[in-house]
Amino acid sequence: RDAQESRGLGDVYKRQINSAGGITWQVDERVPHEDHIEMSGLRVSTVLRYGVDANGAFMLNRSMVWPMLRTIPNNTHASLMRRFAWNVTDMVEVNGQSLLNEKVKEVTLNGTMVVQSEYTLPRKGKLGLTRILFPSVSNPAFCEKYILRNIGESAISVEIPSSRSVVETDAAKGVDGSYKLVSTINGQVARQLQPGEELTFSATFAGYKKDERELSLDIDRELQARQDLIAGFWDNLVLDTPDPVINTMFAFAKIRGAESIYDTKGGLMHGPGGESYYAAIWANDQAEYINPFFPYLGYEVGNRSALCSYEHFARFMNPEYKPLPSSIIAEGIDVWAGAGDRGDAAMVAYGASRYALSKGDKAEAEKLWPLIEWCLEYCRRNLNESGVVASDADELENRFPAGKANL
């Protein structure tokens, strides 16, 4: 712990690396405190703005992103986004009353978010609550599993409702018309919990196109799929140094780098996220940076997304050697080149070469070779008198002054 605190992880809010490799915030009197984290699946991404208020209760706002529910204008930032602040536990009745006076004990990040809380009730009653929050691996939904446990000395009456809330978005603002956003509570029950007994229920936040069938999600199956995915990231390409903070940083970077892939109509597309960049690819973020990483991780979905991105850029090879677009957006049907040539061909040549070398697949390398050759020839044709490839801007896209050649 002393080593962790010296490296900045054990901060004033008592975040620590736990025995399983996750990060746990042990909540004490130093509240309120808020933070945020993004988690993604193939058809959804969610930024959780979470924290503990001055009274010790959990705060949560879900910023939901559906990358394939496209809005108008269908540009780089046209993923449907909505925020949901619904506190699911407000719907729970305990001993005929609302569930009040929550005290959060700890919050753990491990590829899911696990929140442990307690409620003190009259007559030596005490209730424990575990929230497990995570995106579906393959469905357009964010999932929440709730476990209520009687940790007191007297029986507790618990009533869990079923609930379904539907929002239909403005059809004039959607590429495919109106979208349906469905929030549900599942697991309706009324029962007595004896000391030591527990019950579970769940909530989901899903988004659909008008003609899509609503899904009935099995929360345990969804959780297992997420845990299996995270275990695959966690157990492969393990960084082992004398510094546990660096090891943990790398482990979480693997999760974020690999989970942020979306199953678009243009194929699997990795996206930076951040409530801005989805269902699109960039010559720097994807072609140059993340794609060569996936073969080392051994993540087949990542490898497929890498090959898909290079195939998209290959569409723009041309005999006149005009620049490649900086990004291919909107599920692959449009491009953005607003900063001119950022040195994008050099980025693609470098990334595609490294990907081919690290993947070690001759057939894929032969498929990529024409793109690599074209990009290198483009660079050769644009060398300046100092032997540097000329470009209009760099990756910062004129946010700062750029010259005529930008490394």
What are these regions (language model features)?
Residues A231-K367, W374:
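Substrate-binding groove/exosite segments of carbohydrate-active enzymes
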Residues R1, D11-T248:
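Terminal accessory carbohydrate-recognition/targeting modules of carbohydrate-active enzymes
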Residues R131-L133, E159-S162, A203-F205, F293, ...:
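Glycine-rich, histidine-containing beta strand-loop boundary motifs that form or position
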Residues G96, K124, E320-K322, G332, ...:
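Detector for glycine-centered tight turns/loop "hinges" at secondary-structure junctions
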Residues Q192-L217, E275-A279, P325-M347, E377-L407:
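The feature captures the catalytic groove of carbohydrate-active enzymes
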